[in-house]
């Protein structure tokens, strides 16, 4: 029996949607990494119960860190993106977390920069606070070891598995690939490919020169370098626009009854494409959260969704040729692109 709701929320479901297409569905994915990170910090003496944990978030991590702080008797201070909605603000308030939300801003790149600047201001005022640094501290990898074990046990083996998901801070997909490839005893053995999903405008894989007229998909891209992204883990990268991700989210709900967020819709599109390219492999895509935050901006617009059969990626070998609504590039486990 779980000792706290955060443990249940962080445990994913594995759902077979179709032949060799599997959804790894979380209620709140980052709960698993936040819980393990806070537990590790307590165990190593880096923090003590009652301390204040601080970080920046566009949504999912804010809730996850608030839950972890509630579980372990810590205080939580979040500098939130403009994308934090009323429901999440209310949850954070009731959980006792402090939320500073950025002023409305149509440029999420600027929003991200302002959040980091505010973090540094808070640390100057309160040097006793512990900055969780979800974008840079690989303590956030730890929680995904148990998820990798569950995937391996459920599927019987990780061999021949392709993992697809939003890159974001790098911890989730990067950690899953690392743990699945090495196995439970640290032996490098499994044939696991990793496919990262990015929005246009993200600098993580060198697409900062592109723009999406609608919005950069919160949580899976970045306008600043992230230390937790290990580029050498990724075999392939897909860049997917808001409109294409919307179509994926709607189709996932309509076809498979999975109600999930916008990044999941993007991952679903990429996963279907990868399965078509390699029918001998099992493709697993990550659904990081439920669709409740996206009811008005995505699911209520279901009549606008393009049929996914009409969508296919443009194959590129040069990032200078990236184009909306969807591009795909073999990354081949290369190093990070030059700034």
Task: List each language-model region with its residue ranges.
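PLP-dependent amino-acid enzyme catalytic core
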Residues: 1-339
């Amino acid at each position: 029996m779980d000792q706290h709701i955060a443990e249940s929320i962080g445990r994913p479901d594995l759902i077979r949607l179709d032949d060799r297409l599997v959804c790894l569905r979380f209620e709140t994915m980052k709960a698993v990494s936040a819980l393990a990170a806070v537990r590790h910090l307590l165990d190593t003496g880096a923090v003590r119960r009652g301390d204040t944990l601080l970080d920046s978030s566009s949504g999912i991590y804010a809730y996850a860190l608030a839950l972890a702080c509630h579980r372990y008797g810590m205080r939580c201070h979040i500098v939130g993106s403009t994308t934090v909605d009323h429901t999440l603000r209310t949850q954070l308030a009731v959980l006792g977390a402090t939320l500073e939300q950025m002023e409305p801003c149509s440029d999420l790149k600027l929003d991200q920069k302002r959040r980091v600047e505010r973090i540094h201001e808070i640390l100057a005022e309160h040097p006793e606070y512990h900055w969780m640094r979800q974008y840079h501290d690989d303590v956030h990898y730890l929680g995904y070891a148990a998820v990798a074990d569950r995937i391996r046990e459920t599927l019987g083996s990780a061999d021949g598995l392709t993992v697809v998901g939003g890159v974001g801070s790098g911890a989730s997909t990067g950690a899953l690939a690392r743990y699945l490839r090495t196995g439970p005893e640290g032996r490098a053995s499994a044939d696991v490919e990793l496919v990262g999903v990015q929005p246009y405008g993200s600098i993580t894989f060198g697409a900062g020169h592109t723009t999406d007229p609608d919005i950069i998909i919160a949580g899976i891209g970045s306008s600043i370098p992230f230390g937790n992204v290990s580029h050498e883990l990724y075999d392939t990268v897909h860049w997917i626009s808001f409109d294409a991700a919307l179509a994926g989210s709607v189709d996932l709900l309509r076809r498979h009854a999975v109600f999930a967020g916008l990044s999941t819709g993007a991952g679903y599109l990429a996963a279907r494409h990868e399965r078509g390219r390699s029918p001998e492999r099992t493709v697993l895509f990550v659904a990081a959260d439920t669709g409740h935050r996206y009811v008005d901006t995505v699911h209520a617009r279901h009549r606008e969704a393009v049929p996914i059969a009409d969508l296919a990626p443009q194959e590129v070998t040069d990032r200078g040729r990236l184009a909306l609504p969807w591009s795909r590039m073999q990354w081949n486990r290369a190093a990070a692109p030059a700034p």
